[in-house]
């Protein structure tokens, strides 16, 4: 709700740090936010019947074109930053290297599709090595226009303090038994 409030009041921050214990849904939330941002118009233009009401949820239909493109990792407005392959290419590297972060430069050099937003998901920011963390920090200090960076972190205390200070934090916690029961009931389970 904090993210949606910021969106609906026009105070959408360029950097969001999504934190919480492993398995709580941080990456899932990052993908939902990305889908929402890429599928929702930048400006609520007034049409024949006035401006549409502000969105109440982050829900985007699974058959929406943006949903399909994100599922295929082919949306031009999304950049996924995660550990890449080792030099041998036989497994994933132990950390996100600065060479992976530099690829963001090419992404930002292109204008956003349809003049819309660009979204970067860093999953997980805990995996950034020192040089990569400093490169991300520079982008957070001078963000490109209409870009939102979503940093997933299991241990935010391990990140550079300056990265934490440049982001708004969304702290996730496991659902309690009553909240879990309500969620299951709402889902029809």
Spans of features found by a protein language model:
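Non-catalytic interfacial helical region
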Residues: 24, 85-189
